[in-house]
Amino acid sequence: MVPVGSPYFADYMLRLLIEMGRAEEAQSIIQERWGEFSRQGGTSVWEVWDMEQSLSHAWSCAPVPLAAHYFLGVHQRDSDLGENYWILPIAGSLRTVRGRVMTKYGAVHVEWKT
């Protein structure tokens, strides 16, 4: 696989991997790449993989919406104007997941174990 050039591009690649049934590979990349931020002393996500640019950059937050949509599995039903949601998580290598997603109707709490 071609190395991920930046955290920005990683969002597209991670989504594609998960949609192709390769969630464990996507989770491994998340643990390796985003874990490196904290191993290098970071307290936020950086614009690039090293500390040469902005040390707090929104485009580097790719794992956050991925976690809500794929790993928690919270999906809004397209036909219901956001009032109804369904839960269909993709576990990959995860064994326990707990979290919540905020909606205009309140929080959707999810917890599951394999």
Model-derived features: where do they sit?
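Solvent-exposed loop and edge beta-strand segments that line ligand/cofactor-binding
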Residues: 1-10, 52-59
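Alpha-helical support elements that line or immediately flank enzyme active sites
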Residues: 7-21
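Non-catalytic C-terminal accessory modules of carbohydrate-active enzymes
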Residues: 19, 24-114
